[in-house]
Amino acid sequence: MQNASLASIISENREYWTGRAASYSEVNLGELATSQRKKWSFCLRSEISRQFPDRAPSQIRVLEAGTGPGFFAILLCELGYDVTAVDLTPAMLVEAKKNAGPLAGRICFLEMNAESLDFPDSCFDVVVSRNLTWNLPHPDRAYIEWARALKPGGLLLNFDANWYAYLFDDEAQAAYEQDRINSAAQGVGDQNVGENFDAMEDIARRVPLSDIYRPVWDLELLSSLGLQAEADEQIWKRVWSEQEKLNFSSTPLFLVRARKLSGASAPGYSAR
């Protein structure tokens, strides 16, 4: 029953995010129109430059897993990287291409499941993702695939949070409710309630990461794959807007940063 439930999540996710594509695109456009654009661009450039200090962006091939309406793909293309962006939902890719405007022709947008990449081994220098792994039915498979697609010496950057932990933990539930109170008191719109919110909560109850403490889980898995992994649990302070800090105080964004060691040949990301 559990396996059947997880298998259905792929189609449910596609259906849900098809319905959310337009409104989620508006959220991304808002980020592109504010200081978030500069904050995130600086963050991405700094992380990648630290790993590849002597290489020009045009020589660095980047994969974004779960691009959604294209926020990261657009920023990375503006920074000069060679960008491929994949998403499970065709409607999201339509929004991403639209949002990219004249940059769309420089970004390779592909419909693809982040848990099963249609790329050869060791073909990307960097893999990036934001707010995706929590929503996956098999996040371990996604990490295995991302590690496989990374070149030796490559960099993985995954920005995520313990979204929906409040469904399983009383303390997290109380903190979540306090976020709602604080946001209302400050006159800030509640970003935690989107279209068809009940449907997403239903999915969140069934995906494996909602009741697992992260990023500890991520670091343990990546280390088991032979990657050198660490977490930055203060990244939210540098990239979130004041509105996001109020809305999501109880679920701060973290960054999982992992490096595939040069010459590594660890179980889990060998050729399929």
PLM segments and residue spans:
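Class I SAM-dependent methyltransferase SAM/SAH-binding core
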Residues: L63-A65, P69-S116
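A short glycine-rich, Lys/Arg-flanked "PGG" loop and its adjoining helix->strand segment in the class I
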Residues: D140-P152
